[in-house]
């Protein structure tokens, strides 16, 4: 046979001796169509891609199916950049080879082909009998259409045309098989709507016409059976379908419909699995199975494509995927816990000690209460069914013991290891870890879920977290619990109180799930930055564990043992290419960071690593690189902070104060100046001071005025002088009473024109009688003072007991002076200086 252009198609079946429309858009196919029209009288081959491959992936002959068809272009309809091409399809052909060139025509890809003729075999008498049988079946199928109007395969028009073709073609020559071949393909073309690729290619690849005719006749018989079956279904199944073949066909039809609708009967299978499980190892509580049956019955009555059906399927999926009684095994080994905590965290001795106590109680109560019957889950390693979960008695969940182990809340500045500490607890126990971020959560539904009546409803964060964990005893971290707030949508904290109360969380009810869930096996750990923003009701339900600011030695040790190994790994550096001493690490910490944790320190060390990598690629570094202070200044720029503090001459009215914030300890300066004014006793406050701090400044001024003679400023004209108090860094809001003694000292210094040494700082609340009241965060304030070179700190007498928490390295460099009344500070600074 002659060589012609060809196009390759996928996802479309084209029968020989039929009319077919193909949408053309790819450059190769458009070129083939053009060549066929201009040089080959509209003749073209149509081939199928093998295994339904993309047309663009055709590179060789073996990428095509063995058989295709010859066709002639009948009509082309332009549709934008696409062409709808109508083909008059002729005989079946066998692909031989594909080319890029054909005579004077050529293209960048293979768009020309050569083929061989397909030779058929078959007994003329048998084929004649088959044809007579097919003609009779076609007439029967046509009559069935006339009687019931049933939609069968090709429809009324296709069957009528088929009947007409068989009636007209009466004279068949015994010398050729062409007429039988045409008849077979007309049947297939008429019934092409529902028959599969497998059947189609089975006929294409078979050259024995007798076998092909058998397949075609079977298709006709099935079409008649399906037509009669449709009649019975449409008449509400008036008769019982006792015939086994009818029953099979009906089920097959239902299966195909569900397959098209993608309805996989997941809910029904889930119920089957639940009920087939052994009684002593059943994962699902009885009331869950009943709820699932009810929901499955509702789903069965819905239209499969309706929105309600999709909502119901999602709900069923949630119920079947929640772990319910499934738990993971625990590694209750104190030595292992201690090893893991020390591996991931340096220092933090008090938090580690409390966590060991916490896990010790879990271990001991577990041994004392071995009544818990754990049944292994088949096919899942380290997964068990806890029979004591969801025990339903008289409508309430009761357990043999109450889980009275308190819920830990880790309090500390950012970067001090709260989240990693929670992960270490999960690792030590061998439990799954789930983190739930609560920062900015304002809606109660985020915790308790949305009711399913709302569009886009979802379960709350707690149930979603348990689903993600896949077990009912994970470690759940409630991160930034102090950052939640409430608005008109409800109070998420109130919903969280139920979760965190061991007396109530055995029957926690999510609005979306609408079924009680036992949270008693969940180990909740919360984190927060400060106590101030934690609501009062939460204090009764959790135990606070404070993670304080790291010292210089601790930061250096953490950098050496944890940060550097991670940074070297991330940047593919060796220890010789990143040589840094503890002295240089301390230099970076003192002069480039002001933080409680080590996050910024890690960023700086990582920045140095990246610059070393650049030098290696520029061939400026070979096998070794030593980082000294000069290299640090070159890589990180000038020093950001002065570790020796303010070395300028002390000035009257300027005093160092110490503060404790959610981000750790910090130092600040109080400035006071005076100037004449017509306003009597005016006091100006600037620097974004909030109410408590403004009141503290007012109290300090009142105390100074009432004791002016004692402080040596009795001749000062308060009535005609304005006193201005400023706290630098005015963009940052400041509050708290602990700057009272600092305000007092700064006012006395400004009015008496006597400067206070830069190496002195103080903290403490003051009363109108001059009593110095205790403050919080002494350790953090002391660490902040040590970073700026402070040598003496005045603290309240009542805080003397807290000096035990201050690291020895800080106490070695700083003198702490406990005072009960302000007079003691005045005498130390002003009178001692005069002497």
Swiss-Prot record:
Keyword Magnesium in annotation: no
Enzyme class, first EC level, given as a word: hydrolase
E.C. code: 3.4.21.53
Keyword Protease found: yes
Lon N-terminal domain ranges (all copies): 4-224
Induction profile: By heat shock.
Keyword field: ATP-binding, Cytoplasm, Hydrolase, Nucleotide-binding, Protease, Serine protease, Stress response
Listed GO biological process terms: cellular response to heat; protein quality control for misfolded or incompletely synthesized proteins
Subcellular location: Cytoplasm
Active site: 738, 781
Catalytic activity field: Hydrolysis of proteins in presence of ATP
SUPFAM superfamilies: P-loop containing nucleoside triphosphate hydrolases, PUA domain-like, Ribosomal protein S5 domain 2-like
Molecular function per GO: ATP binding; ATP hydrolysis activity; ATP-dependent peptidase activity; sequence-specific DNA binding; serine-type endopeptidase activity
Major location category of this protein: cytoplasm
InterPro entries for the chain: AAA+_ATPase (IPR003593), ATPase_AAA_core (IPR003959), Lon_bac (IPR027543), Lon_bac/euk-typ (IPR004815), Lon_lid (IPR054594), Lon_proteolytic (IPR008269), Lon_Prtase (IPR027065), Lon_prtase_N (IPR003111)
Domain Lon proteolytic residues, every copy: 649-832
Name of a matching Pfam family: Lon_C
Source organism, top-level taxon: Bacteria
Subunit field text: Homohexamer. Organized in a ring with a central cavity.
HAMAP family assigned to the protein according to its UniProt record, in alphabetical order: lon_bact
Protein function: ATP-dependent serine protease that mediates the selective degradation of mutant and abnormal proteins as well as certain short-lived regulatory proteins. Required for cellular homeostasis and for survival from DNA damage and developmental changes induced by stress. Degrades polypeptides processively to yield small peptide fragments that are 5 to 10 amino acids long. Binds to DNA in a double-stranded, site-specific manner.
Family: Belongs to the peptidase S16 family.
Protein name according to UniProt: Lon protease
Chain's gene name: lon
């Amino acid at each position: 046979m002659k060589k012609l252009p060809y196009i390759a198609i996928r996802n479309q079946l084209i029968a020989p001796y039929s009319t077919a429309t193909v949408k053309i858009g790819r450059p190769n196919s458009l070129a083939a169509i053009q060549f066929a029209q201009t040089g080959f009288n509209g003749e073209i081959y149509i081939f199928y891609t093998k295994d339904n491959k993309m047309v663009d992936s055709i590179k060789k002959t073996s990428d095509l199916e063995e058989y295709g068809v010859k066709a002639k272009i009948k009509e082309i309809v332009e549709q934008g950049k696409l062409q709808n091409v109508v083909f008059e399809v002729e005989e079946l052909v066998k692909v031989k080879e594909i080319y890029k060139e054909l005579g004077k025509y050529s293209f960048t890809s293979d768009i020309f082909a050569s083929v061989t003729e397909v030779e058929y075999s078959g007994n003329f008498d048998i084929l004649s009998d088959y044809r007579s049988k097919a003609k009779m079946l076609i007439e029967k199928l046509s009559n069935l259409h006339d009687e019931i109007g049933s939609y069968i395969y090709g429809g009324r028009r296709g069957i009528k045309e088929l009947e007409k073709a068989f009636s007209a073609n009466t004279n068949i020559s015994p010398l050729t098989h062409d007429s039988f071949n045409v008849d077979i393909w007309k049947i297939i073309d008429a019934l092409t709507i529902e028959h599969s690729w497998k059947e189609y290619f089975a006929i294409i690849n078979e050259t024995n016409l007798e076998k092909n005719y058998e397949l075609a006749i079977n298709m006709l018989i099935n079409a008649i059976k399906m037509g009669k079956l449709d009649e019975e279904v449409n008449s509400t199944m008036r008769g019982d379908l006792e015939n086994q073949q009818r029953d099979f066909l009906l089920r097959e039809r239902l299966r195909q419909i569900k397959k098209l609708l993608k309805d996989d009967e997941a809910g029904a299978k889930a119920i089957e699995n639940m009920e087939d499980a052994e009684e002593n190892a059943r994962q699902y509580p009885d009331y869950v199975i009943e709820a699932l049956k009810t929901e499955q019955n509702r789903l069965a009555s819905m239209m499969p494509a309706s929105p309600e059906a999709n909502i119901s399927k999602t709900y069923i999926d949630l119920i079947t995927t929640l772990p319910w009684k499934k738990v993971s095994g625990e590694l209750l080994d104190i030595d292992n816990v201690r090893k893991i905590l020390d591996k991931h965290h340096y220092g933090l001795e008090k938090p580690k000690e409390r966590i060991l106590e916490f896990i010790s109680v879990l271990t001991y109560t577990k041994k004392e209460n071995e009544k818990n019957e754990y049944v292994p889950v088949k096919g899942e390693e380290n997964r068990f069914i806890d029979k004591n979960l969801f025990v339903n008695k008289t409508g309430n969940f009761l357990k043999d013991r109450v889980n009275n182990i308190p819920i830990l809340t880790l309090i500390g500045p950012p970067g001090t290891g709260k989240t990693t500490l929670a992960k270490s607890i999960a690792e030590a126990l061998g439990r799954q870890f789930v983190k739930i971020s609560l920062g900015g959560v304002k809606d109660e539904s985020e915790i308790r879920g949305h009711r399913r009546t709302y569009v886009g409803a979802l379960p709350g964060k707690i149930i979603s977290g348990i689903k993600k964990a896949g077990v009912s005893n994970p470690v759940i971290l409630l991160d930034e619990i102090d950052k939640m707030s409430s608005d008109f949508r409800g109070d998420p904290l109130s919903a969280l109180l139920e979760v965190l109360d061991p007396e109530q969380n055995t029957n926690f009810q999510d609005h979306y799930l609408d079924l009680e869930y036992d949270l008693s096996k969940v180990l909740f750990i919360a984190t927060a930055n400060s106590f101030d923003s934690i609501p009062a009701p939460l204090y009764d339900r959790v135990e606070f564990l404070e993670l304080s600011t790291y010292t210089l030695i601790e930061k250096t040790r953490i950098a050496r043992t944890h940060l550097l190994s991670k940074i070297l790994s991330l940047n593919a550096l060796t220890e010789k290419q990143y040589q840094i001493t503890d002295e240089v690490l301390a230099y970076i910490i003192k002069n480039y960071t002001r933080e409680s944790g080590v996050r910024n320190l890690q960023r700086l060390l990582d920045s140095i690593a990246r610059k070393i990598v650049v030098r290696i690629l520029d061939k400026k570094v070979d096998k070794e690189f030593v980082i000294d202070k000069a290299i640090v200044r070159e890589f990180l720029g000038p020093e950001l902070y002065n570790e020796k503090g303010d070395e300028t001459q002390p000035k009257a009215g300027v005093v160092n104060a110490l503060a404790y914030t959610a981000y750790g300890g910090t130092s600040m300066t109080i400035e006071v100046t005076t100037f004449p004014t017509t306003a009597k006793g005016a006091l100006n406050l600037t620097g974004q001071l909030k109410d408590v701090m403004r009141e503290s400044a007012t109290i300090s001024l009142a105390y100074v005025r009432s004791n002016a003679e004692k402080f040596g400023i009795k001749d000062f004209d308060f009535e005609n002088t304005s006193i201005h108090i400023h706290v630098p860094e005015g963009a940052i809001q400041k509050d708290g009473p602990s700057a009272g003694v600092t305000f007092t000292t700064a006012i006395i210094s400004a009015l008496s024109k006597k400067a206070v040494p830069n190496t002195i700082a103080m903290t403490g609340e003051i009363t109108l009688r001059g009593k110095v009241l205790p403050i919080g965060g002494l350790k953090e304030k002391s660490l902040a003072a040590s970073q700026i070179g402070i040598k003496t700190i005045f603290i309240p007498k009542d805080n003397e007991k807290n000096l035990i928490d201050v690291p020895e390295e800080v106490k070695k460099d700083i003198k702490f002076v406990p005072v009960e009344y302000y007079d003691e500070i005045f005498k130390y600074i002003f009178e001692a200086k005069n002497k």
